[in-house]
Amino acid sequence: LNELGPAAAVDQMKAWRAAGDSGKFLRKKSEFRSSLSTDGSTPHLPEVGRYHIYISHACPWAHRVMLVRSLLGLEDSISVSVVDWRMENDGSWIFNADEPGASEDHLHGYSGIQQLYLAADPDFAGIGTVPVLWDKNHDTIVNNESREIIRMLNTHHSLLKGEDDSRTSPLLPSELVDEIDAMIDANYESLNNGVYKAGFARTQDAYEDAVGMLFGRLDELESLLGEHRYLLGDTLTEADICLWPTLIRFDLVYHTHFKCDRNRIVDMPNVWGYLRDIFQIHGIAETCDWTHIKWHYKWSHTSINPFRVVSIGPELDWNEPHGREALSGGS
């Protein structure tokens, strides 16, 4: 899963692929799907300092990668370049070291992500997306699918830090892998992709189908999170990592910009407390750039906001005590 958010309305419609008369949003598939391996099945060995990630702070898919990088202590092992929240008119991401929170392309000095994709594949004809996992040794893209990238980081995190490979990632307990995958699947179409299906719907029926599924799933999670601290119990897992970036953007962006306005997340005490609980984990707040998030969506999507007037958004207290420790019997 990846993020592109074209600025020009015509290019936006092509890139987002609104599907004919149905008016339903269809997400573009990720093109680069190799992986890290230790068995020689791919040329990408998990090694210290070998990999670089390209992300946007606005993008919920890229945010997943930054969360795992922080929680597993991979900051010194995997370097990062951050695109501007602004985009070119064709929908491509650009670098801008003068923009707070963004950077230059630290590896190649390229002006944008599109050059990176063409360097990896001269025949690439699409629009480059983020996140990107880049192999410095082979000077190419390994993968641009967020779910697969975070699974690689969780699987090989010890080797990526130069440690014993026997250590299991705390975010991917072996006994919970099947449940983690099932939870990610359950949340993807209704929530992760559901906000986009609502926002980019081109018929009333498509919109109502999307928001109906979205809020139906949120209601289920409100009930679930009244009983469990995290999605699968007492343990923060990859399932939470895949959901959290979408939900923290909800009240700031999706509620108004994508017309997901039956209610706000702050109106759902269990979900809202869950989001604050994770935000307050050491290292998580530093992965959030609210300015990039707000300005990217509301400025870039000119088919939704043609005059690029960016609303001020809600005031949310992410450091308000969440009181969810009692659900797991500990802090």
Model-predicted regions and their roles:
Residues L1-S331:
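C-terminal alpha-helical interaction module
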